[in-house]
Design a protein with these regions (language model features):
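Extended, charge-rich helix/loop segments that form flexible
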Residues: 1-31, 152-156
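Histidine/lysine/aspartate-rich catalytic loop segments that bind and position anionic ligands
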Residues: 20-51
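General secondary-structure edge motif
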Residues: 8-9, 33, 40, 70
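A short alpha-helix capping/helix-coil boundary motif
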Residues: 2-5, 40-41, 64-68
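C-terminal active-site subregion of NodB/CE4 polysaccharide deacetylases
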Residues: 30, 47-156
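Residue-level signal for pocket-adjacent positions within structured domains
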Residues: 15, 40, 109
Length: 156
């Protein structure tokens, strides 16, 4: 079972040229993937007003649900960044699971602050630009965790 988080505002291909299209998402959904949200316009929640955060969360959720016909309960925080306010907003808007690259987990909302491994294109390549199973293995086994640090102070 795989979960895929995405931004719902996919019609703007000039801003997000590598985004999946709705037909791609619908095909993935039919193939059994669980589709989750990643905001509507790729904002960083901690940098926005509560009004904007709610609008982004609700808008993304609604758009994906309309296209897939399935409730959206998964959310991936952009860059893994969140504040207690953002966690409360996720809960308020009906999400049940929130994924972050930050190792901090809110003990009051453990399912809304689930740590995940952050990998991006090029994150597991060697000095010559080739895929490196050794680097990937180190990342997966937490032996080389440069992407697992979080400078944000979380107050719970």
């Amino acid at each position: 079972e795989r979960i895929f988080g995405l931004m719902a505002d996919l019609d703007d291909s000039s801003r997000f040229p590598l985004s999946l299209t709705w037909p791609m998402i619908e095909e993935m959904h039919r193939a059994g993937m669980i589709i989750g949200s990643h905001t509507r316009t790729h904002i960083s929640l901690p940098a926005e007003s509560m009004e904007t955060v709610i609008k982004e969360l609700e808008g993304s959720k609604r758009a994906i649900e309309e296209r897939t016909g399935t409730p959206v309960v998964h959310f991936a925080y952009r860059g893994g960044q969140f504040t207690p306010r953002d966690v409360a907003a996720l809960e308020r808007t009906g999400y049940r699971f929130g994924y972050t690259a930050c190792p901090h987990q809110d003990p009051q909302h453990p399912t809304l602050t689930i740590e995940r491994l952050l990998l991006w294109e090029g994150s597991s390549v060697d000095g010559d630009g080739r895929f490196s199973p050794a680097i990937l293995s180190c990342q997966i086994n937490d032996l080389w965790p440069p992407a697992r640090t979080c400078a944000r102070v979380h107050h719970v």
